[in-house]
Amino acid sequence: MAPATPATHDPALSHGAPPAPGAPAPANAPPNASGDIAGMQLSGLDQSQIMNLLRSLPGMFSGGKIPDQGQGNKEDAAQTLSNLAQAQPYGQQLPLHYQAGGPGGLPGINDPGPSTHPRGPPNLGQLSAVAMQAAPAPIQHPDQQTNRNDGEQAGNASASTSGKDGDNAEFVPPPAPAPTTGRRGGRSATMGSDEWSRQRKDNHKEVERRRRGNINEGINELGRIVPSGSGEKAKGAILSRAVQYIHHLKENEARNIEKWTLEKLLMDQAMGDLQAQLEEVKRLWEEERMARTRLEAELEVLRNMNGVNAGSAPASKDESAAGTKRRSTDGAEAATAATESSTANAEGERDGKRQRTE
């Protein structure tokens, strides 16, 4: 808080300066701006603090110089009001850290402070109201005058509210919406209006048209797939033939499954019988091979015996030729008889085995 210093009271500052006669009122100024600004009371500041605040405003007094404390007069006050009128409103120009008082900074507007004026502090709210009336009308962008829908109006209102709260950035109008057709265009219509009802009916008709088109395409495809003898084109006849054809296919599938199952069982049984017969043939062939091997061994023994008998015959040269021939004839006959008997036995066994196999 700045120390209380004596200052000369100026009646013009307490009662406010009259508006300039030649300055016309702005056409687009808000109707309640003067009343809102006039309601602001700076009862806790003296003249020195007010001058310090005016000096600290950025860009407010670029064209003139603020007189020092104690040297102000009516002309200086008028110059100050003129500079204030040419600048932006106080709420938009002053940064946020100048609007609210805090510890270690400038005092706030509503903070109480010492007053050295005998008749109270000057009414700066009236001076601000006069400055707002003398301010030029802001130039509006053409895009801001166009009608928006409910969502865009809400966005513009929030943007303007944030600008009034102290945002120094330049206002950028939202981009114009692209022209919409079809269902998106129907959303902009007010609910319950004739336009909304008409768009809703159009959308319903479009949905129904697509549904009927899909149904017709499906029925035509069935008519091409299902065989038809009479060539009927009616939708009901096509559907009836399709149902009958589906039942016929299901019956054929069931019969085919039953036939395939029976054939598989018969094939398995036949394979089992063939396998058993193959095993029996293998067993008989093995027995025949063993019998043949045995007969060949016996025949070899008999041949050896005949060779031994033939070598011992010329040992006695004194024997008569008749006796020698008789013995050799007897031995040959015995060998022949043995061979024939063994051959007959082998053939008998072979015939018996063949009969059993058949």
From Swiss-Prot:
- What is the phylogenetic placement of the source species in the record? Eukaryota, Fungi, Dikarya, Basidiomycota, Agaricomycotina
Residues annotated as domain bHLH: 199-249
Query: Mind listing the GO molecular function terms for this protein?
Result: DNA binding; DNA-binding transcription factor activity; protein dimerization activity
Span list, region Helix-loop-helix motif: 213-249
In terms of InterPro entries, this protein maps to:
bHLH_dom (IPR011598), bHLHzip_scCBP1-like (IPR047206), HLH_DNA-bd_sf (IPR036638)
**Biological role:** Transcription factor that may regulate the expression of the gene cluster that mediates the biosynthesis of psilocybin, a psychotropic tryptamine-derived natural product.
SMART domains, from UniProt?
A: HLH (SM00353)
Pfam families listed in its UniProt record: HLH
Q: Name the residues that span the membrane.
A: none
The cross-references to CDD domains, in alphabetical order and at most eight, read: bHLHzip_scCBP1
Which stretches does the entry tag as region Basic motif? 199-212
- List compositional bias (Polar residues) regions by residue number: 79-91
| Feature: compositional bias, Pro residues | 18-29
Q: Report the protein name in the record.
A: Psilocybin cluster transcription regulator
Q: Where is the composition biased (Basic and acidic residues)?
A: 195-209, 347-358
What is the protein's species of origin?
Psilocybe cubensis
